[in-house]
């Protein structure tokens, strides 16, 4: 037979299925055989190429070897067909060509395999099963045979859908996402078969098949049926397969379009949600089952209870029967398996009984009795029906079956009851636990409410006390103002009366006064006591602390007028008076005449009595101070001037004093215990041979004690001239003008004083003023008297007429009194070398007695009082002078408020995993994670109160404006309820104190100490550069980072120096680390931080700061009096270390080094690195954990 050339193109495409079929019928068997021979060679070669491309491109057409045949496991990537599925068995003709080619590529394609028989059988079966051809009238047996041969030819030796172009197009579509693609029919040389054509091929007039909406399985089955019926040629099968693939690809692409692209996190979230829903559904099913079981159990229990109530046997009998059954089963445990098998034993017995009954049919009654006995003895039936109904068993078989059922029911019933009892017990325990938890929560809530109510009540009470205190202060201020106005009015009247009386009496008593003044100015001081007895008694009465309150105000005013006009000559002084007294510096106001002496008081027996201490300006009665060396003697040149002046003054005094003597005769009897009078500075300075009487604050023989001066009182005091005094000693210049102007007429009538006497008086007054300025008590309380000085000045005596009316209007009390401000609590203290301090508050006395010894108080009174005052202010005692907040803002700009510093965000939404890690005096510290940055930060929570508001604002402002690598970074601050949350940088290494607490086991070497000092100095240099002071440098405020970073923290006590206020004097900080100038209350600057750094350096070297073994008050006293103790084992430390300490701990602030200069010290060159320092931190942390573990083990034992 002549071979036809190989066809390179498929059959031409037609539009109608009938045309295709007619073209198909024209082919004969011969043509088919020729076509088969022509296609064998090329197909095998092309199949090899295809197989190579499949290996290279990793096609989705995978094959599985079943016996000697290989079949693909799937057709396309989007529509897999598993070989194990039942549908895959129907598709063997479709993929038969592929399996054959893969097989023939190995066997050169020259022989048929066993698969040919299989497909022949399939085709023959299909032809035999379809005797009537579906293609129409032209079909016959020959066409059926030719169709079978064609299918054998085309399906066995050629691939159904796989070609090189198919693989290329499939691969391109796989990597071109979401792009439409179809397999065009032109590539196969055929035409596309529509749904109408397929339906017409099937010959069905029913509804057309919907490819788009049908499933893959339906389309596959439809295609297989058509192939099995022989309705497709090669082109049609390819087109149909392409159609099926395109439909599935379109569905997949449409699904991808509806489903947006997602990343891995979203995919995980979706999967988690899907699993959660699945678990929820499963839990719901389980829950429903449990509910159903619960309802069933309840119903069963209800039925059992009703059944028990109807039972004829009692509960005791039932329990007895159950107990017998349990005992019997325990006895049989030795021969029985570990689990009970009651039914098996009963069956065996029953079988034996059945055999006996079969053998002995005549003895039925005996067997029945035996069965009954076995039932009673072995089973102990608790079936209540047998007892209630008393059933008589007639047949042995029925009795055996009943026994088996009863035994099984009894066992199940017991197990069910036991399980029910356990469940009830579990539920009861669960309910009790829930009730306990609810009760605990209610109790906690009630306690929390009670605590909040208590705190609220305490705050309200504090506010009420504050309001009452302010109200009392207002009332006191009002009363005081009224009294001052009344006293000023009386003083004006007395001055007017005294001036009138002086003019009337000056002309009548001039001669007699001249003689009296001459005798009073003698150097020996031997004047007649009788001539001055009456005025002396009057002044003694006025100076007495015991009787001053009993004198009528009008009489006192009259006596003041008489005394201002003139005074009798001074009495002779006793020889035992100490000449070393310097208490004249405490004398009252200056007299009308510069050299007028004070008059001593003489009792009825003619004995000199010292004047009360309250007379000379002291704040307390009965207090004493150590005396001073005697004053230098003055030349006798001014004696004549003194005599002349005394003549003129005493001229007017005798007349006025005679009038007042009769009014106070009754009061003079009580003045016998008066003390020695005081002498004014003018007397002491202008009398060459006069002796200076002892101070009203006592004359002592102690020479070592320093001279102290009594601080002034705020209430009114009567001076030696009779005028009232409302101010402190520093007001004498103002008072001097008043008294001098009131007596100017009398002094001018006698010719005045000589110029030399005036000059000497001025020189001596300036000396006394310098002494007062240097006085300890003035220095201590001078700042608290500034406002009082300006308000207590008395008006001049020469004012009259309209001037008096204007002053009245100015002094008139307004109907509304404003809120008091700058309220002070002055403490008036005196020192006696014999008795110690006098006039101290009770708290101060307790502090001194409990912390100081008597010799220390005598030797260092100023230091003791300094330390006590500092401690009182630091501890906030009630009687301590108030610490006034600085009125200067932190900067020259307007002051910052809390609203300017806080953020309005909710910190609970920003931070999570908030865990407490510590607490202190200022508040609690928490560790949290910032959700925005995913960084660990620290949160400091503080209660907002009026007392700490300024401190909080100061700390936040300082941290916010400080950006340095050695200062803890500030993040933000928030207000949550009544708390302030300050978010800052988290330092995982803790504070330096935690390392120093392990000093016994871990000591820092010099390089590590130098590293800490270097980092701290860098931070101090930064804040000092911006004129800020930290004022609380200590180990607790030095924080350590994860890599050994050192940073400053806690700026609550920090201060900002300004152009106006370049120094500070407020008492803040921690006592053991405070500089001496800060303890004494002197002005200080940046150098206090350097001192604190030196103390902290010693703390790192010795494990604790100096004097830590003493109480704070004692430590402060030792620091101010004895200085710092020498460092322990000084020889172990290098010369540079000791020099660095000396520069830091220099008492003289001028010589003390600054932070910038210390950064260049040679000691800091030995500093180690941060990681090396952190080794010590890590070792201290491990040591602390070990200690805690050991302690926990001990407590557990």
From Swiss-Prot:
One of its GO terms (cellular component) is uropod. Residues 19-30, 51-69, 439-458, 728-737, 757-790 have a biased composition (Basic and acidic residues). Disruption phenotype: cells exhibit a defect in completing cytokinesis when grown in suspension, suggesting difficulties in regulating cytoskeletal organization required for cytokinesis, although karyokinesis is normal. Its main location: cytoplasm. CDD domains: CRIB_PAK_like (cd01093), STKc_PAK (cd06614). SUPFAM superfamilies: Protein kinase-like (PK-like) (SSF56112). Its cofactor is Mg(2+). It catalyses: L-seryl-[protein] + ATP = O-phospho-L-seryl-[protein] + ADP + H(+); L-threonyl-[protein] + ATP = O-phospho-L-threonyl-[protein] + ADP + H(+). One of its GO terms (biological process) is establishment or maintenance of cell polarity. ATP binds at residues 917-925, 940. It is an enzyme of class 2 (transferase). GO terms for molecular function: ATP binding; metal ion binding; myosin II binding; protein serine kinase activity; protein serine/threonine kinase activity. PROSITE patterns: CRIB, PROTEIN_KINASE_DOM. Colocalizes with myosin II to the cleavage furrow of cells undergoing cytokinesis and the posterior cortex of polarized cells. The modification Phosphothreonine is found at residue 585. Residues 34-49, 70-79, 524-536, 593-615, 718-727 have a biased composition (Polar residues). The active site is at 1032 (proton acceptor). Residues 80-94, 346-381, 494-523, 636-653, 671-707, 739-756 have a biased composition (Low complexity). Its EC number is 2.7.11.1. Gene3D superfamilies: CRIB domain (3.90.810.10), Transferase(Phosphotransferase) domain 1 (1.10.510.10). It comes from the Eukaryota. Belongs to the protein kinase superfamily. STE Ser/Thr protein kinase family. STE20 subfamily. Regulator of the myosin II component of the cytoskeleton: required for regulation of cytokinesis. Functions during chemotaxis, required for maintaining the direction of cell movement, suppressing lateral pseudopod extension, and proper retraction of the posterior of chemotaxing cells. This is Serine/threonine-protein kinase pakA. The gene is pakA.
């Amino acid at each position: 037979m002549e071979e036809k050339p190989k066809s390179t193109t498929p059959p031409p495409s037609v539009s109608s299925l009938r045309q295709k079929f007619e073209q198909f019928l024209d082919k004969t068997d011969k043509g088919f055989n020729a076509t088969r021979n022509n296609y064998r060679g090329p197909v095998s070669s092309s199949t090899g190429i295809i197989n190579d491309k499949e290996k290279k491109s990793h096609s989705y057409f995978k094959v599985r070897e079943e016996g000697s045949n290989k079949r693909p496991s799937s057709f396309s990537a989007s529509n897999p067909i598993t070989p194990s599925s039942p549908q895959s068995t129907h598709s063997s003709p479709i993929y038969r060509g592929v399996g054959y080619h893969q097989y023939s590529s190995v066997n050169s394609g020259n022989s048929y395999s066993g698969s040919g028989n299989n497909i022949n059988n399939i085709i023959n079966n299909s032809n035999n099963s379809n005797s009537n051809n579906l293609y129409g009238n032209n079909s016959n047996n020959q066409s059926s045979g030719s169709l079978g041969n064609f299918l054998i030819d085309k399906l066995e030796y050629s691939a159904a859908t796989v070609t090189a172009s198919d693989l290329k197009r499939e691969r391109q579509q796989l990597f071109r996402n979401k792009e439409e693609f179809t397999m065009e029919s032109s590539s196969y040389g055929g035409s596309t078969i529509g749904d109408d054509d397929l339906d017409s091929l099937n010959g069905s007039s029913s509804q057309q098949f919907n490819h788009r909406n049908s499933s893959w399985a339906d389309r596959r089955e439809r295609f297989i049926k058509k192939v099995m019926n022989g309705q497709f040629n090669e082109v049609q099968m390819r087109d149909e397969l392409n159609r099926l693939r395109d439909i599935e690809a379109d569905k997949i692409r449409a699904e991808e379009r509806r489903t947006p692209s997602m990343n891995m996190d979203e995919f995980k979230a979706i999967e988690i949600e899907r699993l959660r829903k699945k678990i929820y559904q499963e839990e719901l099913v389980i829950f429903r089952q449990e509910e159903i079981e619960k309802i069933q159990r309840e119903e069963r229990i209800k039925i059992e209870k009703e059944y028990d109530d109807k039972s004829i046997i009692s509960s005791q009998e039932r329990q007895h029967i159950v107990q017998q059954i349990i005992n019997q089963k325990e006895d049989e445990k030795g021969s029985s398996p570990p689990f009970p098998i009651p039914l098996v034993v009963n069956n065996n017995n029953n079988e034996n009984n059945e055999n006996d009954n079969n053998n002995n049919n005549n003895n039925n009654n005996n067997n029945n009795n035996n069965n009954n006995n076995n039932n009673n003895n072995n089973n102990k039936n608790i079936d209540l029906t047998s007892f209630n109904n008393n059933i008589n068993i007639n047949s042995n078989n029925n009795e055996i079956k009943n026994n088996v059922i009863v035994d099984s029911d009894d066992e199940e019933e017991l197990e069910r009851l036991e399980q029910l009892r356990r469940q009830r017990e579990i539920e009861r325990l669960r309910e009790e636990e829930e009730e306990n938890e609810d009760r605990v929560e209610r109790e906690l809530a009630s306690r929390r409410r009670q605590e909040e109510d208590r705190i609220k009540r305490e705050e309200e009470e504090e506010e009420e006390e504050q309001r009452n205190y302010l109200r009392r202060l207002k009332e006191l201020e009002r009363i005081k103002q009224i009294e001052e106005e009344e006293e000023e009015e009386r003083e004006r009247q007395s001055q007017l009366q005294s001036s009138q009386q002086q003019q009337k009496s000056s002309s009548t008593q001039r001669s007699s006064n001249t003689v009296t003044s001459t005798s009073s100015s003698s150097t020996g001081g031997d004047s007649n006591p009788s001539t001055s007895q009456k005025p002396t008694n009057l002044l003694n009465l006025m100076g007495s602390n015991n009787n001053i309150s009993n004198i009528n105000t009008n009489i006192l005013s009259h006596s003041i007028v008489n005394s201002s006009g003139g005074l009798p000559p001074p009495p002779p002084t006793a020889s035992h008076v100490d000449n070393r007294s310097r208490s004249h510096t405490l004398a009252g106001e200056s007299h009308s005449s510069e050299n007028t002496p004070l008059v001593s008081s003489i009792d009825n027996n003619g004995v000199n009595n010292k004047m009360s201490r309250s007379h000379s300006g002291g704040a307390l009665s009965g207090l004493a101070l150590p005396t001073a060396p005697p004053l230098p003697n003055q030349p006798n040149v001014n004696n004549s001037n003194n005599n002349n002046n005394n003549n003129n003054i005493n001229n007017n005094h005798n007349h006025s004093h005679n009038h007042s003597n009769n009014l106070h005769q009754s009061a003079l009897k009580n003045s016998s215990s008066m003390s020695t009078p005081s002498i004014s500075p003018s007397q002491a300075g202008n009398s060459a041979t006069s002796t200076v009487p002892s101070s009203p604050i006592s004359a002592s023989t102690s020479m070592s004690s320093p001279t102290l001066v009594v601080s002034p009182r705020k209430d009114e005091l009567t001076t030696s001239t009779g005028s009232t005094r409302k101010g402190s000693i520093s007001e004498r210049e103002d008072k001097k003008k008043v008294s001098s102007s009131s007596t100017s007429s009398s002094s001018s009538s006698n010719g005045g004083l000589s110029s030399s006497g005036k000059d000497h008086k001025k020189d001596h007054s300036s000396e006394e003023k310098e002494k007062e300025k240097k006085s300890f008590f003035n220095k201590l309380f001078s700042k608290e008297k500034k406002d009082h000085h300006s308000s207590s000045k008395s008006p001049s005596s020469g004012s009259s007429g309209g001037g008096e009316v204007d002053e009245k209007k100015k002094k008139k009390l307004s109907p509304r009194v404003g809120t008091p401000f700058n309220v002070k609590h002055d403490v008036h203290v005196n020192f006696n070398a014999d008795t110690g301090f006098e006039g101290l508050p009770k708290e101060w006395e307790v502090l001194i007695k409990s912390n100081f010894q008597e010799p220390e108080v005598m030797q260092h009174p100023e230091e003791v009082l300094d330390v006590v005052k500092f401690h009182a202010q630091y501890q906030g005692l009630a009687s301590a002078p108030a610490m006034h907040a600085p009125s200067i803002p932190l900067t020259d700009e307007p002051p910052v408020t809390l609203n300017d510093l806080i953020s309005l965000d909710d910190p609970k939404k920003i931070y999570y995993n908030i865990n407490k890690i510590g607490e202190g005096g200022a508040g609690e510290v928490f560790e949290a994670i910032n959700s925005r940055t995913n960084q660990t930060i620290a949160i400091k929570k503080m209660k907002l109160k009026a007392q700490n508001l300024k401190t909080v604002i100061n700390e936040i402002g300082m941290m916010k404006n400080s950006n340095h690598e050695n200062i803890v970074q500030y993040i933000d601050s928030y207000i949550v309820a009544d708390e302030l949350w300050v978010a800052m940088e988290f330092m995982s290494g803790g504070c330096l104190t935690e390392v120093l607490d392990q000093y016994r086991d871990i000591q820092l070497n010099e390089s590590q100490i130098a590293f800490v000092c270097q980092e701290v100095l860098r931070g101090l240099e930064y804040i000092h550069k911006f004129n800020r002071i930290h004022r609380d440098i200590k180990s607790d405020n030095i924080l350590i980072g994860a890599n050994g970073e050192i940073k400053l923290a806690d700026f609550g006590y920090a201060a900002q120096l300004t152009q106006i206020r370049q120094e500070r004097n407020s008492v803040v900080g921690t006592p053991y680390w405070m500089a001496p100038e800060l303890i004494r209350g002197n002005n200080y600057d940046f150098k206090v931080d350097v001192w604190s750094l030196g103390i902290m350096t010693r703390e790192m070297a010795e494990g604790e700061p100096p004097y830590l073994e003493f109480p704070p008050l004692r430590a402060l006293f030792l620091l101010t009096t004895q200085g710092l103790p020498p460092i322990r084992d000084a020889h172990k430390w290098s010369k540079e270390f000791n020099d660095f300490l000396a520069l830091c701990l220099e008492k003289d602030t001028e010589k003390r080094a600054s932070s910038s200069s210390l950064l260049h010290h040679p000691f800091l060159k030995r500093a180690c690195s941060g990681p090396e320092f952190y080794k010590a931190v890590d070792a201290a942390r491990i040591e602390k954990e070990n200690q805690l573990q050991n302690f926990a083990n001990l407590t557990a034992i």
